[in-house]
């Protein structure tokens, strides 16, 4: 099972025929189901087997069996869960189909000899994950529904998709001034050590409640005492609102909350801060702040990060444009 998951994880790094029956009431054979059309993209069909045999679907089924048992997918609840997962994976297959079509249009598909060579290289990289143990590699292929041939075809598609993405994003550039601007606006991200703050808060539902709390605190009432009385954060209420040490870059907290907390000086108490959870009164018990690294020492890392973000933005915009211009039809009834 671990070997299968390992292969699926590698394969899932990628971007991720028509059947005739006299009547819908007639039960299709497994072969007919596999060949049934689940989508058409500019006239090209995506068959159910393309979805069922995909690494993403194999990974989903493996996870479902591990968590819920072998029989879960046969239940009504299981079928509904699997159908929803299939709909999401189908959307990815449609995106891949559009990209493969654009590969032909943009003339970025390598010649067969070169494409085979690149695919073989990727196969060898996957084998290296298994320490080049051919038997273990073949056993894992079998358990994930692949043969050597179908794996290679899958990888060839991923190579083409990668080349299309590279073509779309090749002109993306980031100037030094862009990096400098980002550095100036986010200096707390570039300290010698991560800046941290010890934080307490009081959470209430309404702004009026928050103003009343702030008034009590301005009158020098004890923060922890007030938190225990009125805070609606069950995780910190009994600790006097204490959240503990938080890194400035911690993404587990609401961005608005973090921005307000970082702006406060040590010992300060905020005005009401509104987030998706309600209204907070934030207290900074202490801070540990470190010197900021010089711009030149982090410039290239910033440019690399900004370039990746711009490339992702350019790719997302282009694929949405291509899909909107494509003729796409789905057949959800054939998913199960």
Swiss-Prot record:
> A GO term (biological process) for this protein?
protein folding
Cellular compartments annotated: Cell membrane
Per the record, its GO cellular-component terms are: plasma membrane
Q: Extract the signal peptide range.
A: 1-22
Q: Where is the PpiC domain?
A: 194-286
Q: Which of the seven top EC classes does this enzyme belong to?
A: isomerase
**InterPro entries reported in the protein's UniProt record:** Foldase_PrsA, PPIase_dom_sf, PPIase_PpiC, PPIase_PpiC_CS, PrsA_foldase, Trigger_fact/SurA_dom_sf
Q: Does the keyword Cell membrane apply?
A: yes
Residues with covalent lipid (N-palmitoyl cysteine) sit at: 23
Q: Quote one Gene Ontology molecular function term.
A: peptidyl-prolyl cis-trans isomerase activity
Q: How does it sit in the membrane?
A: Lipid-anchor
Main subcellular location of this protein, as a coarse class = membrane
Keyword Transcription regulation applies: no
Pfam families cross-referenced by the UniProt entry: Rotamase_2, SurA_N_3
Lipidation annotated as S-diacylglycerol cysteine: which positions?
A: 23
Keywords recorded for this protein, A-Z: Cell membrane, Isomerase, Lipoprotein, Membrane, Palmitate, Rotamase, Signal
Q: Which reactions appear under catalytic activity for this entry?
A: [protein]-peptidylproline (omega=180) = [protein]-peptidylproline (omega=0)
What are its E.C. numbers?
5.2.1.8
Q: Which HAMAP family match?
A: Foldase_PrsA (MF_01145)
What is the role of the protein in this entry? Plays a major role in protein secretion by helping the post-translocational extracellular folding of several secreted proteins.
PANTHER family with a match to the protein in the record: FOLDASE PROTEIN PRSA (PTHR47245:SF1), PEPTIDYLPROLYL ISOMERASE (PTHR47245)
The family classification in the record reads: Belongs to the PrsA family.
The protein depicted here goes by the name: Foldase protein PrsA
Organism expressing this protein natively: Clostridium botulinum (strain Kyoto / Type A2)
């Amino acid at each position: 099972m671990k070997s299968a998951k390992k292969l699926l994880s590698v394969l899932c790094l990628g971007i991720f025929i028509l059947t005739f029956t006299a009547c819908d009431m007639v039960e299709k054979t497994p072969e007919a189901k596999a060949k049934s059309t689940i989508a058409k993209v500019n006239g090209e069909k995506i068959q159910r087997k393309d979805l069922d045999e995909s690494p993403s679907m194999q990974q989903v089924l493996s996870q479902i069996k591990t968590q819920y048992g072998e029989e879960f997918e046969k239940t009504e609840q299981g079928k509904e869960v699997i159908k929803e997962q299939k709909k999401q994976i189908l959307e990815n297959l449609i995106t891949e189909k559009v990209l493969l079509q654009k590969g032909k249009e943009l003339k970025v598909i390598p010649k067969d000899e070169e494409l085979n060579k690149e695919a073989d290289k990727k196969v060898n990289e996957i084998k290296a994950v298994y320490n080049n143990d051919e038997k273990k590699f073949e056993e894992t292929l079998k358990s994930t529904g692949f043969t050597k041939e179908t794996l290679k075809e899958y990888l060839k598609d991923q190579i083409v998709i990668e080349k299309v993405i590279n073509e779309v994003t090749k002109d993306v550039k980031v100037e030094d001034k862009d990096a400098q601007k980002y550095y100036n606006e986010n200096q707390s991200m570039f300290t010698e050590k991560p800046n941290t703050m010890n934080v307490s808060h009081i959470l209430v539902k309404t702004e009026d409640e928050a103003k009343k709390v702030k008034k009590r605190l301005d009158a020098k009432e004890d923060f922890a005492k007030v938190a225990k009385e009125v805070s609606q954060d069950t995780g910190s209420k009994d600790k006097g609102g204490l959240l503990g040490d938080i890194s400035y870059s911690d993404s587990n907290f609401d961005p608005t909350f973090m921005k307000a907390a970082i702006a406060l000086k040590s010992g300060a108490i905020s005005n009401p801060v509104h987030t998706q959870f309600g209204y907070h009164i934030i207290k900074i018990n202490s801070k540990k702040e470190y010197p900021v690294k010089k711009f030149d020492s982090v410039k290239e890392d910033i440019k690399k990060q900004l370039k990746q973000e711009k490339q992702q933005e350019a790719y997302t915009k282009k694929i949405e444009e291509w899909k909107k211009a494509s003729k796409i039809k789905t057949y959800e009834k054939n998913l199960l």
